[in-house]
């Protein structure tokens, strides 16, 4: 079968089909079990982070090195020509992509990755653009879910915390809607899942419901996906009241299925108590580690006709 991701821009999870997603997950699984060190040999990848990042940037760069490639780029846009000399993003992309085989970008502005693709001579991979999309986070989430559940089909998932501004839950809901998931949304009313996501799910015949507490749905879940309630969006007293409702402790896991796993895009603050870390349900650190394999798989597929 031809590789559908070869030379493709990866800008939004909505641009990828069920077949595309399965291919990345299967390739990530293969690379984790049987490492390859030649798939990016003689390839140079631009890693251009206009916004702070730890896990995404380091896992991308690790993925490139482990596949035999090289990385150029920056983690501090303040020292680039864009900041110092007023160069446009379009001009920067034109120049940088003339040096490289792929262009990985994180940018605070929504739509920056799609704009970059208009001026790039090589495939563009979106490593996060504002509150819009973060497709490679979704790919590592899917890989982690598949790794723990043995399937992506027909799973029951709860999303907890900031569902309004959290780009990870938007993309993951869109992706898993292709696999017949059932969703439980648990958040403050002010941070509820956006209408456009709910409308998309309804159009696809995907079941979802809204809840006030995790305990209501815990026995049903295959995956519990926690996110941080962002303190800066509330008054201090209101934040303390809201955040306290969405803190997970080990005691609350007593009714969970034995193989239920907890995921979190990290960083966590107070929303998962440290006593959860030692339970067999905690999988968020392994999830972060899977970022290397998911990004290896994506880079290998985008830059090789056959993998």
From Swiss-Prot:
It catalyses: carbamoyl phosphate + L-aspartate = N-carbamoyl-L-aspartate + phosphate + H(+). Pathway: Pyrimidine metabolism; UMP biosynthesis via de novo pathway; (S)-dihydroorotate from bicarbonate: step 2/3. Keywords: Pyrimidine biosynthesis, Transferase. Carbamoyl phosphate binds at residues 55-56, 106, 134, 137, 266-267. The keyword Transferase applies. The keyword Transit peptide does not apply. Its EC number is 2.1.3.2. One of its GO terms (cellular component) is cytosol. Heterododecamer (2C3:3R2) of six catalytic PyrB chains organized as two trimers (C3), and six regulatory PyrI chains organized as three dimers (R2). HAMAP family: Asp_carb_tr (MF_00001). This is Aspartate carbamoyltransferase catalytic subunit. It comes from Tolumonas auensis (strain DSM 9187 / NBRC 110442 / TA 4). The gene is pyrB.
């Amino acid at each position: 079968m031809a590789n559908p991701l070869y030379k493709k821009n990866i800008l939004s999870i909505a641009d990828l089909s069920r077949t595309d997603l399965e291919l990345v997950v299967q390739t990530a699984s293969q690379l984790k079990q049987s490492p390859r060190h030649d798939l990016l040999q003689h390839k140079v990848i631009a890693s251009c982070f206009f916004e702070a990042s730890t896990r995404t940037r380091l896992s991308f760069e690790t993925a490139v090195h482990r596949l035999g490639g090289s990385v150029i780029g920056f983690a501090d846009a303040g020292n680039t020509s864009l900041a110092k000399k007023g160069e446009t993003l379009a001009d920067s992309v034109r120049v940088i992509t003339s040096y490289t085989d792929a262009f990985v970008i994180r940018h605070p502005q929504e739509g920056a990755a799609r704009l970059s693709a208009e001026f790039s001579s090589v495939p563009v991979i979106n490593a996060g653009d504002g509150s819009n999309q973060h497709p490679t986070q979704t790919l590592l989430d899917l890989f982690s879910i598949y790794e723990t559940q043995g399937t992506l089909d027909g799973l029951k998932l709860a999303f907890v915390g900031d569902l309004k501004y959290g780009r990870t839950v938007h993309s993951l809901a869109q992706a898993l809607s292709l696999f017949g998931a059932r969703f439980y949304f648990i958040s403050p009313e002010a941070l509820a899942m956006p209408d456009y996501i709910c409308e998309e799910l309804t159009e696809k015949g995907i079941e979802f419901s809204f809840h006030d507490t995790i305990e209501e749905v815990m026995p049903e879940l295959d995956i519990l996906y926690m996110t941080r309630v962002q303190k800066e969006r509330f008054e201090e007293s209101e934040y303390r009241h809201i955040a306290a409702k969405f803190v997970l402790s080990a005691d609350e896991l007593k009714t969970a299925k034995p193989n239920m796993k907890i995921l979190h895009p990290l960083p966590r603050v107070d929303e998962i108590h440290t006593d959860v870390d030692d339970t067999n349900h905690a999988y968020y650190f392994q999830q972060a580690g899977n970022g290397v394999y998911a990004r290896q798989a994506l880079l290998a597929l985008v830059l090789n006709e056959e993998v």
